[in-house]
From Swiss-Prot:
Protein name per its UniProtKB record: Prunin 1 Pru du 6
PTM summary: Proteolytically processed from a single precursor to produce an acidic and a basic chain that are linked by a disulfide bond.
Gene3D superfamilies for this protein: Jelly Rolls (2.60.120.10)
GO MF entry, a single one: nutrient reservoir activity
Residue interval(s) of motif NGXEET: 367-372
Tissue and organ expression note: Expressed in seed (at protein level). Expressed in seed.
Residues binding Ca(2+): 194
Length: 551
């Protein structure tokens, strides 16, 4: 009897332990019991040498529900955002500016190579200088010969000097040839770089390192979404950035104790007392904070076949710079020249490719040969008004991006949407069928309402430029642009996210029979017909004020 009791007790403990573990795994889903949402600006800021990184507190309930984290990166002119990778897939939207982005795929070849012509330009300049020196030497020798006519001894000395000079020139020429050959062998090669500009959406898989550089004439601003609940993230749901250079600070507070940006501007104790860089304690220790920093210096030097001084530079020892550094001079690397005609040609190619995909449909997507791993297309521009998928001359326009027009999103299971609404324009009330929506306000303002399953408005707020808010899956939402118009970008946590509308020509109400509407809402059949057919627009709706203004 006692043995049976002990066995039952052990079995109960094991069962409870398994149940607790299962509940901990499902905790992100249980975080979606939300009573209130809020649109807000970033909670934390890290000041860097050539820019800043701002992050939203991912421990807030709405971020935990959506399984995402977000940051905003500002890179000043001639600033370099150092290479890093993340434990979660990223979707990046370029809000402002232009620059260059490079993504490193392990095992792929370096397809960008410095031409021999560019490397020979430097040698030609050196040879030109040598010729000028030889001409000057020849003139000096001629003058010496005129003087040597008066004295035989002087002529003999002159001949000896000329002979020695020729021998030195021959020796220098022989030494120069292997140096030129060595320079030819050491031409710069690297993986593909991509031009980025306002309106671009860039997809970065988990674990893929990337860097970015601002070579434009204004600040480069980007908003990053980290899909931490993705299947590609095998760690916990804390966003992690692994930097491969510099002495970076932690962008996301793992303890969830977010510091207001106002405090960051005034300086947090031991962290922001300097204009940029690591805390003073770590600076005194001379330890870096990138991936190389944790390795033994001697072992790292042996692995890379370099001296220990170079290894210490990789580790960021005694380096006070963090994530974004200022480039001295210009950043010179191999990239194809781009003129106006090339940009127009690239845009036409993208439009043609998109039309072909729409015509061929899923057959092109399923053959598995459209793109190789090393040539994945990572970006698509959805800022061009001509690219709009939905347009109303009195309300605004909406552009969507999914796995059909950017195939890598099928792998990341993300999609995006960009909208621009005129003054008082309305985004039809709707719900997201299969995704959460993370909305960033690019410009303007709007009134936004979000309703939960109990009919409660858990968000009723006027959102402003620079704020971000989350609309959970299946929650009803309506947006109306303010006096300044409303321009936004929305990250969607599904590769082909779609919505169901509550108003308009393709709405839920339009699909119901008249009698169902009349009985469901206690209205007459005539009123039901008006409810169904009064609105002929689809998603971008003009307000009554706009219609009166047109009349």
């Amino acid at each position: 009897m006692a043995k049976a009791f002990v066995f039952s007790l052990c079995l109960l403990l094991v069962f409870n332990g398994c149940l607790a573990a299962r509940q901990s795994q499902l905790s992100p889903q249980n975080q979606c019991q939300l009573n209130q949402l809020q649109a807000r600006e970033p909670d934390n800021r890290i000041q860097a040498e050539a820019g800043q990184i701002e992050t939203w507190n991912f421990n807030q309930g709405d971020f935990q529900c959506a399984g995402v984290a977000a940051s905003r990166i500002t890179i000043q002119r001639n600033g370099l955002h150092l290479p890093s990778y993340s434990n979660a897939p990223q979707l990046i939207y370029i809000v402002q500016g232009r620059g260059v982005l490079g993504a490193v795929f392990s095992g792929c070849p370096e397809t960008f190579e410095e031409s021999q012509q560019s490397s020979q330009q430097g040698r030609q300049q050196e040879q030109e200088q040598e010729r000028q020196q030889q001409q000057q030497g020849e003139q000096g020798r001629q003058q010496g010969q005129q003087e040597q006519q008066q004295e035989r001894q002087g002529r003999q000395q002159g001949r000896q000097q000329q002979e020695e000079g020729r021998q030195q020139e021959q020796q220098q020429g022989q030494q120069g040839r292997p140096q030129q050959q060595q320079q030819f062998r050491q031409l710069d090669r690297h993986q593909k770089t991509r031009r980025i500009r306002e309106g671009d959406v860039v997809a970065i898989p988990a674990g893929v390192a990337y860097w970015s550089y601002n070579d434009g004439d204004q600040e480069l601003v980007a908003v990053n979404l980290f899909h931490v609940s993705s299947d590609h993230n095998q760690l916990d749901q804390n966003p992690r950035k692994f930097y491969l250079a510099g002495n970076p600070e932690n962008e996301f507070n793992q303890q969830g104790q977010s510091q207001p940006r106002q405090q960051g501007e005034q300086g947090r104790p031991g962290q922001h007392q300097q204009p940029f860089g690591r805390p003073r304690q770590q600076e005194q220790q001379g330890n870096g904070n990138n991936v190389f920093s944790g390795f033994n210096t001697q072992l790292l030097a042996q692995a890379l076949n370099v001296n220990e001084e170079t290894a210490r530079n990789l580790q960021g020892q005694n380096d006070n710079r963090n994530q974004i550094i200022q480039v001295r001079g210009n950043l010179d690397f191999v990239q194809p020249p781009r003129g106006r005609q090339e940009r127009e040609h690239e845009e036409r190619q993208q439009e043609q490719l998109q039309q072909e995909r729409q015509q061929q449909g899923e057959q092109l997507m399923a053959n598995g040969l459209e793109e190789t791993f090393c040539s994945l297309r990572l970006k698509e521009n959805i800022g061009n008004p001509e690219r709009a998928d939905i347009f109303s001359p009195r309300a605004g326009r909406i552009s969507t991006l999914n796995s059909h027009n950017l195939p890598i999103l099928r792998f990341l299971r993300l999609s995006a949407e960009r909208g621009f609404f005129y003054r008082n324009g309305i985004y039809s009330p709707h719900w997201n069928v299969n995704a959460h929506s993370v909305v960033y306000v690019i410009r303007g303002n709007a009134r936004v309402q979000v309703v939960n399953e109990n009919g409660d408005a858990i968000l009723d707020q006027e959102v402003q430029q620079g704020q971000l808010f989350i609309v959970p899956q299946n929650h009803g939402v309506i947006q109306q642009a303010g006096n300044q118009g409303f321009e936004y970008f929305a990250f969607k946590t599904e590769e082909n996210a779609f919505i169901n509308t509550l108003a308009g020509r393709t709405s839920f109400l339009r699909a119901l029979p008249d009698e169902v509407l009349a009985n469901a809402y206690q209205i007459s059949r005539e009123q039901a017909r008006q409810l169904k057919y009064n609105r002929q627009e689809t998603i971008a709706l003009s307000s009554s004020q706009q219609r009166r203004a047109v009349v």
